[in-house]
UniProtKB/Swiss-Prot annotation:
InterPro entries recorded: dUTPase, dUTPase-like, dUTPase-like_sf, dUTPase_trimeric
Enzyme Commission no: 3.6.1.23
Family: Belongs to the dUTPase family.
Function recorded in the entry: This enzyme is involved in nucleotide metabolism: it produces dUMP, the immediate precursor of thymidine nucleotides and it decreases the intracellular concentration of dUTP so that uracil cannot be incorporated into DNA.
One Pfam assignment: dUTPase
Reactions mediated catalytically: dUTP + H2O = dUMP + diphosphate + H(+)
Name of the protein in question: Deoxyuridine 5'-triphosphate nucleotidohydrolase
Cofactor: Mg(2+)
Length: 151
């Protein structure tokens, strides 16, 4: 298992609010919690930045972290990430902030300590462009959206 440096920025983390953990042995994502003083109510269409009380430093340029919505919040309540996916570069050292968007029809209240997003670690490959005049031909060619059909 890879070790990632984490800094607790809010003393409630690890006491009132549990540290991020994997829910099961097969979980890909660590749950991130809202490190709030008071509940925050989001009206339909509203967004807000929610602190986690944590900063990470991945340090390894072959890794990045991604913040993703929790499936139940998105499906049942319309609560997703305002930027859809949050990308954390290996050299970032600031607080993890979660952009929360209420795309649902009802007000939604985020409670202090509530699990509102998940974070996964993914491999990174930095590419170098090779300028060419043409590509080698493939069966697909320039076929784009819907090119391969629905069934």
């Amino acid at each position: 298992m890879k070790k990632i440096d984490v800094k607790i920025l809010d003393p409630r983390v690890g006491k009132e609010f549990p540290l991020p953990t994997y829910a099961t042995s097969g979980s890909a994502g660590l749950d991130l919690r809202a490190c709030l003083d008071d509940a925050v109510e989001l009206a339909p269409g509203d967004t807000t930045l929610v602190p986690t009380g944590l900063a990470i430093h991945i340090a390894d340029p072959s890794l990045a972290a991604m913040m993703l919505p929790r499936s139940g919040l998105g499906h049942k309540h319309g609560i997703v990430l305002g930027n859809l996916v949050g990308l954390i570069d290996s050299d970032y050292q600031g607080q993890l902030m979660i952009s929360v968007w209420n795309r649902g029809q009802d007000n939604f209240t985020i409670q202090p300590g509530e699990r509102i997003a998940q974070m996964i670690f993914v491999p990174v490959v930095q590419a170098e462009f090779n300028l060419v005049e043409d590509f080698d031909a493939t069966d697909r060619g320039e076929g784009g959206f819907g090119h391969s059909g629905r069934q």
